[in-house]
Amino acid sequence: MQLSIQHNHVHLIVEADDKRAMASGMQGFQISAAKHLNAAISKGKPGPRRRGTVFPDRYHAEIITSPTQARHALSYVMINRKHREDQHGPASTWKLDWFSSAITFPGWTEYGDEAFLWRGPPTYDPLMVFQPRTWLLREGWKKKSGSISCREVPSKRR
């Protein structure tokens, strides 16, 4: 549903029918990601192709149950870059984190209901994701605080 690639981990917001479906989906994601990352790391290097684990831990799951929690999770995942910059250095001039699915998120304050795909650099290949099926992640998250601004800083004390 939404994702953000960090330096040493990945943030995901996913929907699953139950714990078994979540575990199966996450296992499939980790296997596929490990194969692709190992191939990319090995590309052009002599010797055997890199193999093995890419993710040292399994995953941490948190069940989202309220509109406020859903909005916070969406903001945190898609604007995580600003959270890091707020703690560790100068802010980027990027409005969006190009290493996330933020470019395809339809709930930005700045574009209302009109825009669905922000323009990126000419060589940018956006991370496309499925749109949510559940009411909570499709529209319920807007109930309390409305749409999300790309200028917000997640978890910043106000």
Locate each region found by the language model.
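Short Pro-Cys-Gly-centered "Cys-loop" motif that presents a nucleophilic cysteine in a tight turn
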Residues: M1-H7, A16-R158
